[in-house]
UniProtKB/Swiss-Prot annotation, chains A, B:
Cofactor(s) demanded: Mg(2+)
Protein name: dITP/XTP pyrophosphatase
One GO term of the biological process aspect: purine nucleoside triphosphate catabolic process
Keywords tagged on the record: Hydrolase, Magnesium, Metal-binding, Nucleotide metabolism, Nucleotide-binding
Species whose genome carries this gene: Ignicoccus hospitalis (strain KIN4/I / DSM 18386 / JCM 14125)
Gene3D superfamilies xrefs: 3.90.950.10
Positions with a binding annotation for substrate: 10-15, 70, 145-148, 168, 173-174
Similarity comment: Belongs to the HAM1 NTPase family.
EC number, UniProt record: 3.6.1.66
Catalytic activity: XTP + H2O = XMP + diphosphate + H(+); dITP + H2O = dIMP + diphosphate + H(+); ITP + H2O = IMP + diphosphate + H(+)
Cellular component GO terms, alphabetical: cytoplasm
Amino acid sequence: MVSKKVYFLTSNPHKAKEVSDVLSQFSIEVVPLKGEKLEIQADSVEEVARFAAEEAKKRFKERPLLLEDSGLFVDALKGFPGPYSNYVYRTLGLEGLLKLMEGVEDRRARFVCAAALVKEDDKIVIEVGEVEGEIAYEPRGDKGFGFDPIFVPLGYEKTFAELGEEVKKRISHRARAFMKIAKHLSGE
Amino acid sequence: MVSKKVYFLTSNPHKAKEVSDVLSQFSIEVVPLKGEKLEIQADSVEEVARFAAEEAKKRFKERPLLLEDSGLFVDALKGFPGPYSNYVYRTLGLEGLLKLMEGVEDRRARFVCAAALVKEDDKIVIEVGEVEGEIAYEPRGDKGFGFDPIFVPLGYEKTFAELGEEVKKRISHRARAFMKIAKHLSGE
């Protein structure tokens, strides 16, 4: 099978690794493109990813160009921290989120990833992947990054940070979004 | 004294009223310009206001054009909620912020406002106003908006929501930023 090359705009090496793990299963080679994407304030990761893709396509000439935005949406907190998950992780941390969930019985949450593809013809495709789960009562595990140590995906008893890449590359929000993107790339 | 007219881009009627209260003291008339400003994700309100002003000056022809971005920065929470104060107010609310501060002795916080002025010659001026204070232990008062009911400015025992506009128009972050802006407008 001929391998295809795509560029992935990110400043997060964890994300580059995860996207590469997913796309390599489709014989797609991921070339990290170091740089900042422009992120707007919006209530959905789709909106953030779409705006970032529109802006990045003017600034970068590499094609196909990928980027993504993702977040943890906690039902009992009206979706918080949502698209601001990175900022909230850096300020409140896992402890802050767990404090907000103290005494809260409804632990349901979902990770959502919006992946954006800027195609050779400059058209933009957005695909969204989600994984449902629950917020744990304490951090567990040391794999992954961000809120992984307190997220238990539906059907599992371990957190993403305990399960690690073998499971994440099959069921994570990012895996699900980029598997859909892989179909667009193979079809090009 | 000749009154001068300025346009203020906002979707928040409370902010329009507060800015008008401040600038009317300088014989400056504020005309609200209804519309959304484009807000980026950034760790400071200055960055958010500057980007919004650069974008707004392309989209609106009215001059002088004002806009602002503001936020509540809590020391013990590494500045959270900062530039995302509106989102955090809509999701976690006052209760969520108070829950994060449970058992926290260091209550210090500051409201920061970055006011942007797009002048007749399209040059942009940014002025920042701050007010120091503390996070209260429970909400008090029904004036103002946002986090006003849990913010006690330094030198006072009441919250902004108890003190109301007579005090806010003299000492608030927004008042302080727009008093500096008034000097630019009078000097034009």
